[in-house]
Amino acid sequence: MRKIIHIDMDAFYASVELRERPELKTLPVVISSHHPRAVIAAASYPARVYGLRSAMPMGQARKLCPDLIIIEPNFDKYRAVSHQIHQIFQQHTHIIEPLSLDEAYLDVTENLNNLPSATDVAIQIRQQIWEQTSLTASAGVAPNKFLAKIASDWNKPNGLCVIKPHQVMQFIQNLPLKKIPGVGRVTQDKLQQLKLETLGDLQHIEEAVLIQHFGKYGKQLYLYAQGIDHRSVQAERVRQQISKETTFDQDLYLHECSSYWLMLAEKVWQSLQNKNLQARGVNIKLKNKHFQVFQHSKSFKRALQSLDEFKSVLALLLQEISLTLDDQYRLIGVGLYQLSPSASESQLTLW
């Protein structure tokens, strides 16, 4: 039986900044640029009380909380702290799959310190993170990645949730389907139309029926309903593509997606820089409200030189794909491919 830990730092970017400005800890703070089309990179917990959240356009955020405090992001600082945290992980296992600067899966089926349980490993990691960085982390411990990720969010912030193998079916019985990765507003609406509210409800539905309604994702839903996730924790390796996508709570017209394009482009470019890689290809992806997928890509003889160039290529791809302005979209994504090491001698890891 595998033992998986999902570590998720609590409001990471905001928490790093608030270490240096403790007088702001009780105030609504967001990490964002002052660009007119900027979106929130992170929101402190007091800011979340107002409904502020990551990826929210700043215009909307200011309406919800006129007195919010904006701090410009400092990714060099966040990478440095991430590296500290990654060093802690490596003291316990070498099987680490970073998802972002503040989130990772760890396979501790066998841990390096011979601690008696995965729970003990998670407790020690969280304690070390606090002692060395003054930041809190939430952790989920479970037999697979799907459950570990859900568990890490269960007692946030600064929480620990453990799902033991014999507790899996009881845990997922009343688990709302909206908690499942990949279940956005549209999928949730379709599930509700079928009178399906929890994973327990899904357990009574045949796999073929779910596939009929949800395509390939129906098979994944069926497995999740049985508490099954065969995915392994993937230790870092050279990636063939770096991409990010987001599913909207409500379908948007194309012109309403502009701030999200900028946010995704910045995240993808930042990930490229973190990996010390360069890219010669750009791709985009959109899914409309009818689940029709549009994709377009373009490659070049030389590597992209800047974030601005990346954004310019994205704008060109959007023009070439000839989308209808009266259509609405539920998902957008951007990516970089044809990756190779950059000219820099030093190879940085994501953490």
Swiss-Prot record:
UniProt xrefs under InterPro entries = DNA/RNA_pol_sf (IPR043502), DNA_pol_Y-fam_lit_finger_sf (IPR036775), DNA_pol_Y-fam_little_finger (IPR017961), DNA_polymerase-Y (IPR050116), DNApol_IV (IPR022880), IMS_HHH_1 (IPR053848), Rev_trsase/Diguanyl_cyclase (IPR043128), UmuC (IPR001126)
Q: Where in the cell is it found?
A: Cytoplasm
Q: Which GO terms describe its cellular component?
A: cytosol
Q: Which cofactor does it need?
A: Mg(2+)
- Keyword line: Cytoplasm, DNA damage, DNA repair, DNA replication, DNA-binding, DNA-directed DNA polymerase, Magnesium, Metal-binding, Mutator protein, Nucleotidyltransferase, Transferase
Q: Specify the superkingdom.
A: Bacteria
Q: Which CDD domains match?
A: PolY_Pol_IV_kappa (cd03586)
Protein name as it appears in the record: DNA polymerase IV
Q: Which organism is it from?
A: Acinetobacter baylyi (strain ATCC 33305 / BD413 / ADP1)
Q: What would be the name of the gene that encodes this protein?
A: dinB
